[in-house]
């Protein structure tokens, strides 16, 4: 593992209230970053994690999605897609910058700065696995499989 990222001691607004990542009590955490609510790839990813939430819960693992969208946009996305996971609003890009997920992207022929789809697994507040340049389809299943393997190894 070449990345050494700590969870920041900062409170963020979420669809279910607020969360301070440094104060989470779950043994395991999946923190995934996605570009924008209600877009095809992001919907695929969020629905994938939501469908597997019970399996992650059984492994004492919390799932949190992060984007720059507002809490209201997250709530609309959650309601429309019947999501069961909590989403963090990072409008000020505090988490995005902390995890270095803001990258230059080509969108409709223009260079823009946006979130590079990325996921991080933490065990007892320590980063144990990271995924960069994630493909949305099948990603939640891969993370669940990797989490099970990490738990066997720990």
Which residues does each PLM region occupy?
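Chalcogenol-based redox active-site neighborhoods
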Residues: 1-154
């Amino acid at each position: 593992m070449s990345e050494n990222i700590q969870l920041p001691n900062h409170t963020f607004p979420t669809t279910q209230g607020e969360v301070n990542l440094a104060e989470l009590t779950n043994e395991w955490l999946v923190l995934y970053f996605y570009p924008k609510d209600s877009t095809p790839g992001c919907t695929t990813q969020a629905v994938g994690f939501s469908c597997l939430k019970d399996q992650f819960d059984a492994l004492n693992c919390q799932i949190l999605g992060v984007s720059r969208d507002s809490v209201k946009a997250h709530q609309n996305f959650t309601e429309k897609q019947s999501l069961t996971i909590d989403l963090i609003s990072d409008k000020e890009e505090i988490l995005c910058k902390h995890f270095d997920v803001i990258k230059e992207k080509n969108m409709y022929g223009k260079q823009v700065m946006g979130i590079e789809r990325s996921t991080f697994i933490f065990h007892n507040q320590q980063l144990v696995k990271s995924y960069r340049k994630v493909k949305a389809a099948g990603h939640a299943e891969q993370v669940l499989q990797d989490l099970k393997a990490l738990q066997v190894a720990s």
